[in-house]
Amino acid sequence: MDQFAVFGNPVAHSKSPRIHQLFARQTGIEHRYGKILVPISKFQEALDTFLKQGGIGVNITVPFKEQAFIRANELTERARLSGAVNTLKLLNNNQLLGDNTDGIGLLTDLMRLEFITQGQHILIIGAGGAARGVLFPLLEFGCKITITNRTFSRAIQVANNFSAIGSIRPAEMKVLNSPEFDLIINATASGINGEIPTISPFIFNENCVCYDMFYQANLTPFISFARKHGVSRYADGLGMLVGQAAHSFKLWHGVLPEISPVLLTLEQELRS
């Protein structure tokens, strides 16, 4: 049986194996899917070992998306633009194709939630692989984007990298202190450690919506912080996770599974 896995650090919390189990059951396409904790400095070695053992497809989560981008022999257009890869597929010629399904996963979920409209002003918090993976579809959708990051130079670099696609305003965290945004997206990994980004509470208001690309059974730290400061419409990244996984599954198998029933099952399991 073909082997697939998610690579990350940490990875114990990952719902990806459960999602792909549900996709396999739904489509009748069986595949073995596991999760692999990869030492921070051993991504290349872990990937080579997995491929030698019969692996043909990998999902990549933090902090390895940029390394997967470098490792891929071929890239889809959305992966090339983002500079980050969350899905690898071993081709028949033994070359690795790198894709990024994060953006389509996020956009699909934002549309499902009715969180996004054309012309909206969006603040993206974070400038790593997760943030870069979602910028292309948001720009294509017609959104106005501001990006901020703890290391401001990275926000500037990301804005410059996407200048051919659309205008992104880089802003220092310390100067963001007014409620000018329609949608605020946390694309940092701060929630994994129970932390929040170092942002001003004054960016929130009762009219903006918040989305955390991190997910957990309870409210994420970022969403709890936003709620405390007046936000009443919010969501975590579980829907995005299922959406990006569906498009990874399509890359590997040529079939796009239904997202809604899998998302419903996961929500029920998390609540219980």
Swiss-Prot record:
Enzyme Commission number(s) from the entry: 1.1.1.25
Residues that span the membrane, as ranges: none
SUPFAM superfamilies for the chain: Aminoacid dehydrogenase-like, N-terminal domain, NAD(P)-binding Rossmann-fold domains
Gene3D superfamilies: Leucine Dehydrogenase, chain A, domain 1 (3.40.50.10860), NAD(P)-binding Rossmann-like Domain (3.40.50.720)
Keywords: Amino-acid biosynthesis, Aromatic amino acid biosynthesis, NADP, Oxidoreductase
One family name in Pfam for this protein: SDH_C
Binding-site residues, shikimate: S14, K15, S16, T61, N86, D102, Y215
Gene Ontology BP terms: amino acid biosynthetic process; aromatic amino acid family biosynthetic process; chorismate biosynthetic process; shikimate metabolic process
Pathway: Metabolic intermediate biosynthesis; chorismate biosynthesis; chorismate from D-erythrose 4-phosphate and phosphoenolpyruvate: step 4/7
Active site location: K65
GO cellular component, one term: cytosol
InterPro entries: Aminoacid_DH-like_N_sf (IPR046346), NAD(P)-bd_dom_sf (IPR036291), SDH_C (IPR041121), Shikimate_DH (IPR011342), Shikimate_DH-bd_N (IPR013708), Shikimate_DH_fam (IPR022893), Shikm_DH/Glu-tRNA_Rdtase (IPR006151)
Known function: Involved in the biosynthesis of the chorismate, which leads to the biosynthesis of aromatic amino acids. Catalyzes the reversible NADPH linked reduction of 3-dehydroshikimate (DHSA) to yield shikimate (SA).
Subunit relationships: Homodimer.
NCBIfam families: aroE, PRK00258.1-2
Family: Belongs to the shikimate dehydrogenase family.
Protein name (database record): Shikimate dehydrogenase (NADP(+))
Species of origin: Photorhabdus laumondii subsp. laumondii (strain DSM 15139 / CIP 105565 / TT01)
